[in-house]
């Protein structure tokens, strides 16, 4: 018989902890000067904790490719530092993915504003 869940599931707690630690590591641990201001937005972890997809955004959109290279180059270092901070049976393999949800939201907001400006307000 399955136990009822209390509060957060373990996987959610692990995701939150990985996200916090990676955000700190990216902020303080990346020595590459090409790495701009990177924000870790979300982390998705597989059920067996073998893989973690890290969704991030950057302040300077022009440096998107460079930031991707920097993160890929630092992936092993970030994983080993994460292993020191989080006690898991297996530290997940990190996969970095640019989070386009913010851009999509801004584009959608701009479209709504455009339609609202074109349509006269009726009383």
From Swiss-Prot:
* Subcellular localization: Cytoplasm
Would you tell me the Gene Ontology cellular component terms? cytosol
Pfam name, any one: RBFA
Query: What GO biological process terms are annotated to this protein in UniProt?
Result: maturation of SSU-rRNA; ribosome biogenesis
Indicate yes or no for the key word Cell cycle: no
Molecular-function GO terms, alphabetical: ribosomal small subunit binding
Coiled-coil region list: none
User: Which domain of life does the protein's organism represent?
Assistant: Bacteria
Check the record and name the SUPFAM superfamilies matching this protein. Answer: Ribosome-binding factor A, RbfA (SSF89919)
The keyword Cytoplasm belongs to this UniProt entry's keyword annotation: yes
Keyword vocabulary terms for this entry: Cytoplasm, Ribosome biogenesis
HAMAP family per record = RbfA
Q: What does this protein do?
A: One of several proteins that assist in the late maturation steps of the functional core of the 30S ribosomal subunit. Associates with free 30S ribosomal subunits (but not with 30S subunits that are part of 70S ribosomes or polysomes). Required for efficient processing of 16S rRNA. May interact with the 5'-terminal helix region of 16S rRNA.
The record describes its quaternary structure and partners as: Monomer. Binds 30S ribosomal subunits, but not 50S ribosomal subunits or 70S ribosomes.
Protein family per UniProt: Belongs to the RbfA family.
What protein name is recorded for this chain?
A: Ribosome-binding factor A
Organism, as annotated:
Neisseria meningitidis serogroup B (strain ATCC BAA-335 / MC58)
